[in-house]
Amino acid sequence: MSVRISFVGKGGTGKTTLSAILIDFLIHKNKIPILAVDADPNFNLNELLGIEVETTLSEVRESLLKSDVPDFISRYEYTEMKVHQILVENKYFDLLVMGYPETSGCYCPVHSFLSTALEKLMRAYSYIVIDNEAGMEHISRLNLTEMEHLIIVSDASIRGIFTAGRIADLIKNLKIKAENIWLVVNLCPEDQKNELEKYAKEIIKEKKEIKFLGFLPQDTDLLKYELKKIPVFEWKSKLKSSAYELFEKLFD
């Protein structure tokens, strides 16, 4: 059974960066093979992993909706074949990019084919890392709703921490079953930790299903890595080493 770890939070909190660092962490710990899933329509996880993406799952979805399926193959077999074709393969991990949201049309049968194909695909991996959009629509529609760890990422603000509480409510409403729901406050200045910790404890007291994973520091090196397009595997940064320490808690 695969271990599924999903990151969620409002835009700009660093979900994608932490997803990439977790993939690097898992490889470092020899916890492979890994399937990375970029479920954000504004996908860029591939950039942090140093790989290019040519096709997304949304293009498979649209071809199914238009019935662009050859006569000699069933719709499910076609779906399964296309899902494998759009995988970006790597030595230790593969990447699947969901792509843009639906346009108008009836997608219920399409979602059924895709969710069945994805479930079968995921059984081939020991670890699944999902970088979500804020509303988690993709994983909800495709029934990817059971996971071991769901990590809510907040920025270093009171408003961000309270938004994490609302995301916890959304998780319930979408019937997502997570064995562990964690809160991490990302890119936090050292002198704001004590103040923000009070609000984090307040949310955790109110939303008893949430556990506090910890704070992650600001890191001026991130911009340098981004500008030079250096993949996460080559980073030597304070954020990366601190994230490694937090991720150890997930696998105690």
Labelled PLM ranges:
Residues P41-N42, P101-T103, A134-G135, S157-R159, ...:
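Conserved nucleotide-binding/hydrolysis micro-motifs of P-loop NTPases
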Residues K120-A124, I139-I158:
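Inter-motif core of Ras-like GTPase G domains
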